[in-house]
């Protein structure tokens, strides 16, 4: 099975529009995933989902759009695009919000709360599409795909996803949006948490991972739930990943600075003698897995 991955939002924390971020993009996280059976999964719903909505309507040509929206967690940058996701306001479409059982209640609350009268002109109930909420099992199967989840190290909790062909188990996309690979003392993780994460990621064709901080930035933001890019490269190497995509870019990182960060990651791979392709997520980019 082929998985097709399109990046609609790549920035972390807050939108960062402007000339200096035009290449890699300023919208917050949203990734479109199409399976070999053309099932549609939407990973997170930051501001990038607004343009995805327009694209889906154009491609659908009046036919119903059906999708699962997998939300890693309910922090603003991962849900703030929902009120501007045009297909939700049209009858005939169907969307199911998915989240880990421990997080789903908070996700539904946050989605509704960001559309209350004090902060938005219409409520969540203004949607005309069919809307559902359904918890994700740790392991489950969908239309031609299999999905596994893992808890991430992020304040309030977050969820990572491994998506594969439903029959062969390959190829594998692993999506880990908000995850702190350092600061072991700051989380109640089991002693072998990193080994377990390596096994979850093991052999992925494509790993999309939060790489928000440089080493200096990280020291000022320990406990904020994001990773140094060096730690992300090391995880990908240890797990035998084929391609690593740096994601959840720092909102103040310019295209020039992000290109330098990417080059530093590629240099680290070379110095370790590893075989790993490293990319930086850019809005509008489509990758085939």
Q: Which residue ranges define each predicted feature?
A:
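Binuclear metal-dependent hydrolase catalytic cores
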Residues: 1-174, 182-187, 198, 255-289
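Conserved beta-strand-loop-short alpha-helix elements that form
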Residues: 177
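Cap/insert and terminal regions of metallo-dependent hydrolase folds
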Residues: 172, 180-277, 282
């Amino acid at each position: 099975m082929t998985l097709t991955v399109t990046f609609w939002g790549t920035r972390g924390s807050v939108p960062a529009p402007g000339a200096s971020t035009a290449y890699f993009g300023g919208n917050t996280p949203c990734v479109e995933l199409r399976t070999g059976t053309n099932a549609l999964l939407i990973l997170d719903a930051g501001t990038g989902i607004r343009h995805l909505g327009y694209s889906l309507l154009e491609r659908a040509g009046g036919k119903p759009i059906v999708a699962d929206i997998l939300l890693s967690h309910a922090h603003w940058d991962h849900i703030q695009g929902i009120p501007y996701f045009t297909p939700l306001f049209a009858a005939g479409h169907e969307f199911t919000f998915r989240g880990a059982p421990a997080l789903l209640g908070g996700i539904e609350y946050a989605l509704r709360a960001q559309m209350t009268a004090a902060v938005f002109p219409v409520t969540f109930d203004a949607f005309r599409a069919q809307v559902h909420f359904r918890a994700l099992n740790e392991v489950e199967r969908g239309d031609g795909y299999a999905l596994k989840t893992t808890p991430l190290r992020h304040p309030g909790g977050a969820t990572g996803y491994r998506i594969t062909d439903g029959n062969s188990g390959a190829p594998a996309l692993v999506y880990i949006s908000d995850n702190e690979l350092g600061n072991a003392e700051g989380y109640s993780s089991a002693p072998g948490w990193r080994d377990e994460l390596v096994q979850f990621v093991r052999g992925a064709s494509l790993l999309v991972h939060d790489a928000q901080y440089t080493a200096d930035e990280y020291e000022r933001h320990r406990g904020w739930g994001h990773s140094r890019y060096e730690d992300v490269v090391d995880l990908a190497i240890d797990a035998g990943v084929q391609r690593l995509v740096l994601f959840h870019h720092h909102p103040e990182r310019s295209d020039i600075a992000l290109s330098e960060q990417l080059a530093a990651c590629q240099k680290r791979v070379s110095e370790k003698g590893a075989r790993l392709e490293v990319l930086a997520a850019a809005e509008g980019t489509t990758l085939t897995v």
